[in-house]
Curated annotation (Swiss-Prot):
Zn(2+) binds at residues 16, 18, 38, 41. Belongs to the bacterial ribosomal protein bL31 family. Type A subfamily. GO terms for molecular function: metal ion binding; rRNA binding; structural constituent of ribosome. The gene is rpmE. It comes from Vibrio cholerae serotype O1 (strain ATCC 39315 / El Tor Inaba N16961). GO terms for biological process: translation. GO terms for cellular component: ribonucleoprotein complex; ribosome. This is Large ribosomal subunit protein bL31.
Length: 72
């Protein structure tokens, strides 16, 4: 490998919203990373059925166009 052309590869501490924390190596410029879901709290990996919704497109659509459908 050539010296001086590759990004710095360092340990990054990732913290999930559920409280789970782990360390991995990355070229990310920060020392910490905050996650919304991880393997401990994601429904696919945990086996628990819960809705993972960050309040997105459906609510925004209903807010913009919900009144129009009620008038018909």
């Amino acid at each position: 490998m050539k010296a001086g052309i590759h990004p710095e590869y360092k340990a990054v501490n990732a913290t999930c919203s559920c409280g789970n924390s782990f360390v991995f190596n990355s070229t990310l410029g920060k020392d910490t990373m905050h996650l919304d879901v991880c393997d401990k709290c994601h429904p696919f990996y945990s086996g628990k059925q819960r809705i993972v919704d960050t309040g997105g497109r459906v609510e925004r659509f209903n807010k913009r166009f919900g009144a129009l459908s009620a008038k018909k």
